[in-house]
Each structure stands twice: as C-alpha cells, then as structure tokens.
Swiss-Prot record:
Compartments in which it is found: Host nucleus; Host cytoplasm; Virion
GO molecular function, one term: structural constituent of chromatin
Described function: Histone-like protein that is recruited to viral factories during viral replication and participates in viral DNA packaging and virion production probably by forming unstable nucleosome-like particles. May compact the viral DNA.
Official protein name in the record: Histone doublet miniH2B-H2A
InterPro entries per UniProt: Histone-fold, Histone_H2A, Histone_H2A/H2B/H3
Regulation: induction: Expression of viral histones begins 2-4 hpi and continues along the infectious cycle.
UniProt organism field: Melbournevirus (MelV)
Membrane spanning stretches: none
Pfam families xrefs: Histone
GO biological process, one term: chromosome condensation
One CC-aspect GO term: virion component
Domain of life, source organism: Viruses
SUPFAM superfamilies in alphabetical order: Histone-fold
Amino acid sequence: MDRVGKYGLFIKRISPKDADITKESLETVNNMLVFLAEKLTKQANIIIDQKTLRHDAFLWLLTDIQGELGKHSQDFANSVLYGEKELVFPTKRTENLMRKNTCLRISQSAVKTLTAILEYFCGQIMEASFSQAKKSKRKRIRPIDIEAAISQDKELHSMFGKGVISGR
C-alpha cells in the first residue's frame, strides 16, 4: 500500500472541532498539500545543489510568499524545529514524498520544516473553508467551500491559483 503523501486522517485532526468534512474535500485538501510539497521541493532543488536538501531552502522560499502567510508559516516551522510545538502530520510520509520528487539525501530538519509548512497551510485552508461553510449555514465543509475560500483569500490564491477542484 503506497501511503506517500496521504494526509486524510491528519487533516481531520487539524480541522475545527465543530466542523465536519466530506470525503471529496479531504481528497481535495490532500491533493493541494501534495501540490504544495512538490512545488516547494522543486524550487528548493533549484536553489540548492542536487546532493542534499536542507531546511534553509524551505525557510528562504517562504519569504517570497505575499502577505502574512509566509511569515507566520516560517514562524510555525521554526517553532517546530526548536521543539516548541508538536507536529500532527507524519514526517515519514513527507520524507517519502520528498524522496520521490528530489534527491536521495534529505536532512531531517528539511523534512520537519516541510511537514510544518504543510500542516500550517492545511490549518489555514481548513479555517477559511469552515468560515465559508458557516456563511452558507452549514457545518460540513464541501469542495465548493474550499474553492470559495481560496479564491477570496489573496495569499492562498497566490499559492494555489485557479486549480480545478472536483466534487461539486
């Protein structure tokens, strides 16, 4: 069973307590996180040589993100690296995803940093989607809510763009 980049169970743990999420929405958020991980690892490989991948490259890439999203995700990643916060997402799945797309030598701090970035972005997506579902007087997050939340949030829209979200 190939579990590379499957975060469904952990996305449920990050979602707001009084929210419910459909299966299609879980797949959508999971696909968005895998897209983000692949995008960041490709950019990090361009910055650093192909031999090793370190966490500095990911933190440097976060400075290019517009607005407060990059700054806050960088703070979250640093707090995870220095042991101030615990991760919910598994680092092994992120490491396998990185190995599939990049070089063979990856530092553990790079894995932790990327996992923290994915977890932070997932939390932001879930928060925005739940507030969008609340506006529609629903407790269950659907793919429409995710799409609307991303299109309304300027920073998330700059990261994910107008991607096709299935399950309408």
